[in-house]
């Protein structure tokens, strides 16, 4: 029986070993990390809500009214008043008939996909989908068809050739490592043409895209009984958890069949209570989204890499591809020495040879903070 020493050494040799740092302050651009002040460009707190005083006050109020833990699965006694209210609010906000809460986005996908497709069915997945969608598709035991990134012709051909009794197309809305946006109108049109369902992972679009931040479906004005939207509540919403929204019967089926919903303790009621306030702030958050857009435009206008490649993203995710694992991690370490925290992303998260710095911007970042990052990157290239 191995003690994994050789395996860990192999990770070290390839510059693939992951390490954690300890954050000693609330989520914000300016952090205390391992005892050091740090300017962070690595959080998914896109609207700066995670440390918002209104959310903190709402969480405190929720804890006083409902306690800390929910105590059970939602199907036992864990479904509390804030959960029910939040599901109604999310359905209304995103424009779907019904919404269902999950404890995390990973669990939402891992439960929803196998509930919708199984043996005898077929799943069609974009090659660059998030790990949770990939794992969910494998877990489902459905026939898995992986199509090249955003290749509509390949997807159309695969759908046309499939004889499966039920077909499910799954795709990120905003791809988490490249920052680009999926062609959702075309994906939905293909799904409807071939009698398939479309599940969209809107983890990085909810709160940011569409009128009042209502998400990717609203951004493209999509509506269909065959469309399901998964959104996370720990990114732009500043809290924790996730939801799946869709037609009444589809969501009811997921409630009945999603094992990660049935066998997981419900998220803490104080968080659900705070998220009701978060949805209000998202709805009223045009100024926050405008500031985020300004910071994105600033970065792209001023960071003009010569040797590295800034991928063509217009979202808060701005990937700077360096290439090699060792060089990428060296640049990340040198930025950290300068008080700038930008994570290096390596295989298997991204394809070999495309290791990168994953720069994420927030509405809470200032013009001066982005300028500081750009200056440091220019010095290091």
How would you label these PLM feature ranges?
Residues 53, 57, 61, 65, ...:
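PLP-dependent enzyme catalytic core of the Aspartate aminotransferase-like
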Residues 57, 61-104:
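Conserved N-terminal alpha-helix of the aminotransferase class I/II PLP-enzyme fold
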Residues 2-68, 196:
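N-terminal "arm"/small-domain region of PLP-dependent enzymes with the aminotransferase-like
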Residues 45, 145-200, 362:
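Active-site phosphate-binding strand-loop segment of PLP-dependent enzymes
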Residues 236-303, 308-311:
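PLP-dependent aminotransferase class I/II
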Residues 290-297, 304-338, 354, 361-363:
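Conserved PLP-binding catalytic core of the aspartate aminotransferase-like
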Residues 112-131:
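Conserved PLP-anchoring active-site segment centered on the Schiff-base-forming lysine
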Residues 212, 218-253:
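Active-site PLP attachment segment
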